C-alpha cells in the first residue's frame, strides 16, 4: 500500500476508488506487512459480510495488510447492480489490485468471488502468490443459474432482458441477459 492508502482504516466510512464512467468502488484497507490479502465477495454480497470481516480481524491480529471492497452495484459501491457483468466486476478487481495492493497478494474469494479471483490471477500471475477459494462458483451464470431458467424466465429475458430471480435471502433480484451472455465469454 502507498502512504496515502495506509491512512485508510477499517473503522468508519469506507474509502472510495474512482472507476471509469464516474462510478466509485467502496473499500476498507488495513495496513500491514505483505503480501496483501484481498477479499473478493460473492454475487449480491458485500464487504461487510461475516467472512470478509473475520478475515480482517485475523489480518489485524497478524499485522497483515488486507483489503476488502464492493464491486460495482454491490454494497456501498456506486452503480446499478442490474448493469453489472463478470467483465465489469473483473475490471473492478484488477483496479483494486493495481491501485490498492500493487505488490504481492493473496486472493481470497467466496462463491462468485472465487471465479473473479481466478480471472484476476490469470491476468496478474506475477503478483498473485496464492488463492484461497471458498465454495468457488466458476461459470455460475451457466452452471448454477442455467438450470433455474424455466420457460417463463426465458420469455422475460427475451422480451425485457431481465429475469427477476427468486432469492432465499430476500426480494427477487435482477438477472440480465447481458450478465448471462457476458458470463458465457469467460
Describe each model-derived feature in a short phrase.
Residues 43-56:
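The serine-hydrolase catalytic nucleophile loop
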Residues 83-100:
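Alpha/beta-hydrolase active-site loop
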Residues 101-111:
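Alpha/beta-hydrolase fold nucleophile elbow
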Residues 3-31:
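N-terminal cap/lid segment of alpha/beta-hydrolase-fold proteins
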Residues 114-125, 131:
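Short glycine-enriched nucleophile-adjacent loop
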Residues 56-78:
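Conserved alpha/beta-hydrolase
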Residues 34-42:
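Short beta-strand element of the alpha/beta-hydrolase
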Residues 22, 127-186:
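The alpha/beta-hydrolase serine catalytic core
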Amino acid at each position: 500500500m502507498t502512504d496515502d492508502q495506509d491512512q485508510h482504516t477499517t473503522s468508519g466510512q469506507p474509502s472510495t476508488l474512482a472507476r471509469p464512467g464516474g462510478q466509485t468502488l467502496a473499500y476498507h484497507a488495513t495496513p500491514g506487512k505483505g503480501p496483501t490479502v484481498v477479499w473478493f465477495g460473492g454475487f449480491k454480497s458485500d464487504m461487510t459480510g461475516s467472512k470478509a470481516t473475520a478475515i480482517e480481524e485475523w489480518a489485524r491480529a497478524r499485522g497483515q495488510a488486507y483489503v476488502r471492497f464492493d464491486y460495482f452495484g454491490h454494497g456501498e459501491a456506486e452503480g446499478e447492480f442490474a448493469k453489472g457483468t463478470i467483465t465489469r466486476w473483473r475490471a473492478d478487481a484488477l483496479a483494486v489490485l493495481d491501485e490498492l495492493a500493487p505488490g504481492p497478494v493473496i486472493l481470497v474469494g467466496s462463491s462468485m468471488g472465487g471465479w473473479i479471483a481466478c480471472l484476476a490471477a490469470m491476468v496478474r500471475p506475477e503478483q498473485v502468490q496464492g488463492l484461497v477459494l471458498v465454495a468457488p462458483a466458476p461459470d455460475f451464470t451457466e452452471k448454477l443459474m442455467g438450470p433455474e431458467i424455466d420457460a417463463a424466465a426465458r420469455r422475460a429475458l427475451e422480451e425485457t432482458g431481465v429475469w427477476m430471480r427468486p432469492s432465499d435471502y430476500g426480494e427477487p433480484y435482477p438477472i440480465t441477459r447481458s450478465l448471462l451472455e457476458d458470463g458465457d465469454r469467460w
